[in-house]
Design a protein with these regions (language model features):
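Extracytosolic ligand-binding ectodomains
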Residues: 1-110
């Protein structure tokens, strides 16, 4: 996703380790909130309405808040499935992001 590699490199340089899922999620959340607040100013209703009606693409993928299955204002998005193949982690799902087909059934550990 746009900016993900750059974020990981900057994080590695600053902290001396790879970013965790939580670090990336926190960064993405604050970037989204910061961009939206910069456009809406201090008006809470405008901020809320903008968050509820817009969509973004960032280091964690696409973000669009919506209501579904009894939940409100959730970011319903496809989850990436990673599989180790020949010693490397590879995205195998969703099809739009897959770099290889999933190996199934599991061939076992070597």
């Amino acid at each position: 996703w746009p900016g993900a590699s750059e974020f990981a490199q900057r994080y590695q340089t600053k902290f001396g380790k790879k970013p965790t899922y939580h670090a990336a999620c926190s960064y993405a959340s604050m970037m989204l909130l910061g961009e939206t607040a910069a456009k809406t100013g201090n008006d809470r209703k405008k901020l809320r309405d903008a968050l509820a009606s817009q969509s973004w693409t960032g280091i964690m993928g696409d973000v669009k808040f919506e209501n579904y299955d009894g939940f409100t204002q959730q970011n319903k998005h496809e989850m990436a499935v990673i599989q180790y193949q020949n010693g490397a982690s590879v995205v195998v799902y969703p099809p739009s992001r897959a770099k290889a087909k999933a190996v199934y059934p599991f061939p076992g550990w070597k």
